[in-house]
Amino acid sequence: MLKEIGKNAVKAAEQLKTVNTETKNQILDHMASELVKDVDEIIDANKIDLENAKQLELTAALTDRLTLNKERIQGMSDGLKKIIPLDDPVGQVTQSWKSEDGLDISKIRSPFGVIGIIYEARPNVTSDVSGLCLKSGNASILRGSSYCLDSNLMLSLIHISEPTRPL
């Protein structure tokens, strides 16, 4: 299963490196809008995680980090929207010079390809890193805590949903 996830991520990375800035920004806007639109479904999934946290007797601090409510989901949406005006790093020339032989040399930013991210019981990170990886042209493999499995699954489903308008 992990091998398949990795192969799919590499395929996605190949496609992502060719996506233009306008399309990335449209996708980010779509992701942000879907969070707000699907707030009730996200909260329902989060309730399952919170019930499990109660049964596992997790600390109040950890349970608070797991909790998603309308305000926090709006904050996640706002966070994605804040990525939109950021410069797209892909293709930026950071340095250029001419060698002694007359060869033009440039340092150009390019995507890594696939970024793996392991994070704790913070379902909001799912949206944050998805958006940042998209903007930087990278595919991502996310591994969130099992404490917020249902929340992360719902957020992932929302983020991979097809836009309702053409990009």
Regions found by a protein language model. Give the residues of each.
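Single conserved hydrophobic/aromatic residue that forms the stacking wall/gate
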Residues: I158-L167
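Short, cationic motifs built from Arg/Lys/His that form the positively charged side of catalytic pockets
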Residues: K24, R143, P163-T164
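Conserved small-residue-rich beta-alpha loop and adjacent elements
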Residues: P85, P89-L157
